[in-house]
């Protein structure tokens, strides 16, 4: 049987007694509107950070190819193919330089497989295994983007030299 949430009067067929909390409902609506405005502002900041990062990577590694649609993409996400190196080698080298990234999809962390998402996009396995994915949930500063792009430039240059 269904038990009443609150005891008391007979509102809601005796299952939920009490007067509706109008002030609480209004406060909730105001809070949701403010939260939505903050989310939209953060979305714009993430898009600007992502685009700044993409531009910086393209500047320091012109051979790198951005994966996915150039316009319709997640705000805090950039994925590249780096010809001539494996994503795993690039990942290890970047980690040694203090940069955290991934060579596969977020749902496959810890597995050493070719990213299924890239294969589904039509990339050949030999190309897909040279992927590097960078994700962030807070906007990046210009200094952070420069640090990341410098590390990518040095790492990619070192790895393609050998």
For each feature predicted by the language model, list its residue ranges.
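Conserved PLP-binding catalytic core of the aspartate aminotransferase-like
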Residues: 65-116, 120
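PLP-dependent enzyme catalytic core of the Aspartate aminotransferase-like
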Residues: 109, 113-162
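Conserved core segment of the aminotransferase class I/II
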Residues: 1-43
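Short, solvent-exposed beta-strand edge segments and adjacent coil->beta transition regions
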Residues: 10-12, 75-77, 129-133
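Hydrophobic C-terminal alpha-helix "anchor/cap" residues
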Residues: 57-58, 94
């Amino acid at each position: 049987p269904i038990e009443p949430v609150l005891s008391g009067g007979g509102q809601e067929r005796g299952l939920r007694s009490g007067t509706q909390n109008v002030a609480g409902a209004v406060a909730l609506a105001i809070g949701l509107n403010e939260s939505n405005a903050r989310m939209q502002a953060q979305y714009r900041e993430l898009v600007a950070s992502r685009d700044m990062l993409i531009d910086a990577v393209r500047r320091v590694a012109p051979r790198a190819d951005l994966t996915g649609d150039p316009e319709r993409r997640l705000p805090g996400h950039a994925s590249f193919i780096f010809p001539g190196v494996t994503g795993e080698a690039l990942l290890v080298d970047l980690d040694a330089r203090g940069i955290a990234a991934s060579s596969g999809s977020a749902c496959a962390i810890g597995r050493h497989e070719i990213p299924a998402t890239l294969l589904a996009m039509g990339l050949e396995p030999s190309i897909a295994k040279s992927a590097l994915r960078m994700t962030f949930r807070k906007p990046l500063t210009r200094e952070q983007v420069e640090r990341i792009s410098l590390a990518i430039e040095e790492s990619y240059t070192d790895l393609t030299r050998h």
